[in-house]
Amino acid sequence: MAIKLIVGLANPGAEYAATRHNAGAWYVDLLAERLRAPLREEPKFFGYTSRITLEGEDVRLLVPTTFMNLSGKAVGAMASFYRIQPDEILVAHDELDLPPGVAKFKLGGGHGGHNGLKDIISKLGNNPNFHRLRVGIGHPGDKNKVVGFVLGKPPVSEQKLIDEAIDEAARCTELWFKEGLAKATSRLHTFKAQ
């Protein structure tokens, strides 16, 4: 099944742009830049959108302008309008359980406490079977510190690692369309930024 919608999760507004929780949006921003497809606000989809072609496939990019816990509103609206099935969607999000410098593809699964994923699963009719790009941001080591951590900005050393992992993820996304998910996954999952 080809991917038809790539989503980068974020909170809206300048005050959140550089926070760890917006790592998914950084990836979609990079894809849009690499493929010269600037994102434009599209109110009916509650987000910034663009359209790209990868290996002859028509793909939509989306960064919701809703708050993170309402991400499903944007994803649901676009999926419904273009008749996109859950397994044709790739959602990029920040991942506490992976260190900075690592990113991994995954199909399906739970939300792991991630409010953006939780809302998307709900708005897709409780169907969790969409693809994810998990962008590692690390963990503060104490679950009571998670909210402050994801809404905080990473230090320069960590930002560099996250950026390198996102860059590799963008290359692997293009590889996915060229040579398939298995090859893209194999390459991405052996990558670790230094």
Swiss-Prot record:
The record lists the catalysed reaction(s) as: an N-acyl-L-alpha-aminoacyl-tRNA + H2O = an N-acyl-L-amino acid + a tRNA + H(+); N-acetylglycyl-tRNA(Gly) + H2O = N-acetylglycine + tRNA(Gly) + H(+)
Question: Listed GO molecular functions?
Answer: peptidyl-tRNA hydrolase activity; tRNA binding
Provide the binding site for tRNA.
Answer: Y16, F67, N69, N115
Q: Which residues form the active site?
A: H21 (proton acceptor)
Q: Where is this site: Discriminates between blocked and unblocked aminoacyl-tRNA?
A: N11
Per UniProt, subcellular location reads as: Cytoplasm
Q: What class of enzyme is it?
A: hydrolase
Could you tell me the Gene Ontology terms of the biological process aspect for this record?
protein quality control for misfolded or incompletely synthesized proteins; rescue of stalled ribosome
The cross-references to HAMAP family, in alphabetical order and at most eight, read: Pept_tRNA_hydro_bact
Can you state the subunit structure given in the record?
Monomer.
Family assignment from sequence similarity: Belongs to the PTH family.
Q: Give the protein's biological function.
A: Hydrolyzes ribosome-free peptidyl-tRNAs (with 1 or more amino acids incorporated), which drop off the ribosome during protein synthesis, or as a result of ribosome stalling. Catalyzes the release of premature peptidyl moieties from peptidyl-tRNA molecules trapped in stalled 50S ribosomal subunits, and thus maintains levels of free tRNAs and 50S ribosomes.
The name of this protein is Peptidyl-tRNA hydrolase
Q: Which organism is it from?
A: Salmonella typhimurium (strain LT2 / SGSC1412 / ATCC 700720)
Per the record, the gene is pth
